[in-house]
Amino acid sequence: MQYIKTFLIFIFLIISKIVIAQDEEELLSARVLGIENAPIIIEEYASMSCGHCASFHIQTLPEIKKKYIDTGRAKLLFRDFPLDRTAMLGSMVTQCMNEKQFFPVLNRLFQKQPEWTQSEDILESIFKTLQPLGIEKPMLLSCLEDNETNKNRWKLLLAGRDYAAKQKGVDATPTFFVNGKKVEGRF
């Protein structure tokens, strides 16, 4: 009988570690720009309402993409780190997109950031911003409606942000890591 109890405790601990690992993996899930086996990994934590994050995506990322990502030398891991309600709305919209739509939508929101983040009607402004990309209003609204999928996405965004703050020391946006090492100062 003692052997069975020990065995069950052992199995429980193994399963718990697997679940924790899956949860951690889910918390750290990122959208990837570039090839999977690129030797240089640029990890970005950004907030959709952060002006410096927008500047990086508008001014710096195109050059990095041209020199490193498009040549297979690097890949970008984008991780949301929403700092406020406005950023969370932007994150909910981008995270709702499929792989093909994600980076065009993300880039468009960063390019037009002052317009939609400072609008009286943020949701309508996001819709107008994304309309040229073919994003229809019903699709946009479905990304924000009150359902289990969106509640889980919201919780995951917050949990991922909290995990990055506590476990990786992310305390501002944008924050970058290159091959796991935090880059201080301007990227």
Predicted regions mapped to residue ranges:
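Extracytoplasmic thiol/disulfide redox context detector
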Residues: M1-D84, N152-Q167
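Short N-terminal micro-motifs specific to bacterial/archaeal maturation
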Residues: L33-E36, E44, C96, T117, ...
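Solvent-exposed, flexible loop/coil residues
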Residues: E36-N37, R85, E120, P174, ...
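Residues at structural and domain junctions
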Residues: E36-P39, C50, R79, S91, ...
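Structural alpha/beta surface segment adjacent to cysteine/selenocysteine redox centers
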Residues: A46-M48, A54-Q131, E136
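C-terminal cap of thioredoxin/glutaredoxin-like
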Residues: S47, L61, F127-F187
